[in-house]
Amino acid sequence: MDQVMQFVEPSRQFVKDSIRLVKRCTKPDRKEFQKIAMATAIGFAIMGFIGFFVKLIHIPINNIIVGG
């Protein structure tokens, strides 16, 4: 019985902690959501421009190396 309790007790504690976490969590309000969405959009745009410029620089260099 003691071995069973050693297995069950961590699971029970995990469930208890998880329930407490979910009860503490709150949804972001509209202002906070807009701030997060704007930061994400700016990050996507920056990464897109970086990728575009890397490709823009890489194509002529690749043509010079390959000789095409």
Curated annotation (Swiss-Prot):
The modification N-acetylmethionine is found at M1. InterPro entries: Prot_translocase_SecE_dom_sf (IPR023391), Translocase_Sec61-g (IPR008158), Translocase_SecE/Sec61-g (IPR001901). One of its GO terms (cellular component) is membrane. The keyword Disulfide bond does not apply. The chain crosses the membrane at residues 33-61. Residues 62-68 are extracellular. It is found in: Endoplasmic reticulum membrane. GO terms for molecular function: protein transmembrane transporter activity; ribosome binding. It is a single-pass membrane protein. It comes from the Eukaryota. Keywords: Acetylation, Endoplasmic reticulum, Membrane, Phosphoprotein, Protein transport, Translocation, Transmembrane, Transmembrane helix, Transport. Pfam families: SecE. GO terms for biological process: post-translational protein targeting to membrane, translocation; protein targeting to ER. Residues 1-32 are cytoplasmic. The modification Phosphoserine is found at S18. Component of SEC61 channel-forming translocon complex that mediates transport of signal peptide-containing precursor polypeptides across the endoplasmic reticulum (ER). Forms a ribosome receptor and a gated pore in the ER membrane, both functions required for cotranslational translocation of nascent polypeptides. The SEC61 channel-forming translocon complex consists of channel-forming core components SEC61A1, SEC61B and SEC61G and different auxiliary components such as SEC62 and SEC63. The SEC61 channel associates with the multi-pass translocon (MPT) complex. Belongs to the SecE/SEC61-gamma family. PANTHER family: SEC61 GAMMA SUBUNIT (PTHR12309). This is Protein transport protein Sec61 subunit gamma. It comes from Homo sapiens (Human).
